[in-house]
Amino acid sequence: MIPAYIPNPAAALLGGGTPVDFGKCAKDGRRILGDGKTWRGLIGGIVVGIIFGLMQIFLYNYFNLEFLPKQTIITVCALATGALLGDMVKSYFKRRLGKDRGAKWPIADMYDMVVGSLVLMTLALLVTGNLNWFTENFDSVGFLIATIIAILILSPLLHRGTNIIGYLLGLKDVPW
C-alpha cells in the first residue's frame, strides 16, 4: 500500500494551479471537484507514489524483503493513480452533498484512497491477466485477513497524522 499512501500528502505539497475540473460546475450549480484538486497535485502525487513504489520494488529485490508484497510496475502505477482517483470520486460526492472543501466526512475521508487504489489495481491486474498477483502475495487466508486488518487500522491513523502535519505546516486549512 506504500504507493497508495504517498500520493495524497505529495499532492498537497505539490498542488496548486489549474483545478482538475477547470472551475466548472455540475448541474446542481456546485463545483465538480473544487479548487483542492489540481492538475499539478494530481500528476505530482501520482509520480511521487510511483517513485516510492519503484523504491519498494528495488528494496524487495535487493534486500529480499519478502514481508512486503512483490509489487510490479502495473500494481505500483495502479495503486498510486487509484489513490488520487478515489480521493477525487469522494470529492465529487462531497460536493453533491453540499459539503465544502475540508469538511469532515469521516469514513469516506479515511478510506477513499484505499478503495480507489485497490479497485484500480484489481482492474489493471484483470485487464493484463495478472490476477495471480493476489495468490502470489497472499499465500494464506490468514495473511490476507491480517493485511486487510492492518489496512483498516493504519489508514485512519496515517490519514489523521498526515493531515495534522499538513495543518501544522500550513498546507491544510483544517487538521482533519
Swiss-Prot record:
Pathway(s) of this molecule: Membrane lipid metabolism; glycerophospholipid metabolism
Main location: membrane
Function field: Catalyzes the formation of CDP-2,3-bis-(O-geranylgeranyl)-sn-glycerol (CDP-archaeol) from 2,3-bis-(O-geranylgeranyl)-sn-glycerol 1-phosphate (DGGGP) and CTP. This reaction is the third ether-bond-formation step in the biosynthesis of archaeal membrane lipids.
Cofactor(s) essential for the protein: Mg(2+)
NCBIfam families: PRK04032.1
Protein origin, superkingdom: Archaea
Topological relation to the membrane, as annotated: Multi-pass membrane protein
Keyword Cell membrane: yes
Pfam families assigned: CarS-like
Segments traversing the membrane: 41-61, 73-93, 114-134, 138-158
EC number(s) recorded for this UniProt protein: 2.7.7.67
Gene: carS
Entry GO terms, CC: plasma membrane
Enzyme class: transferase
Organism: Methanocorpusculum labreanum (strain ATCC 43576 / DSM 4855 / Z)
Record-linked InterPro entries: CarS, CarS_archaea
One of the GO BP terms on file: glycerophospholipid biosynthetic process
GO molecular function: CDP-2,3-bis-(O-geranylgeranyl)-sn-glycerol synthase activity
Subcellular location: Cell membrane
Name this protein carries in UniProt: CDP-archaeol synthase
Reactions catalysed: 2,3-bis-O-(geranylgeranyl)-sn-glycerol 1-phosphate + CTP + H(+) = CDP-2,3-bis-O-(geranylgeranyl)-sn-glycerol + diphosphate
Family statement: Belongs to the CDP-archaeol synthase family.
Keywords of the record: Cell membrane, Lipid biosynthesis, Lipid metabolism, Magnesium, Membrane, Phospholipid biosynthesis, Phospholipid metabolism, Transferase, Transmembrane, Transmembrane helix
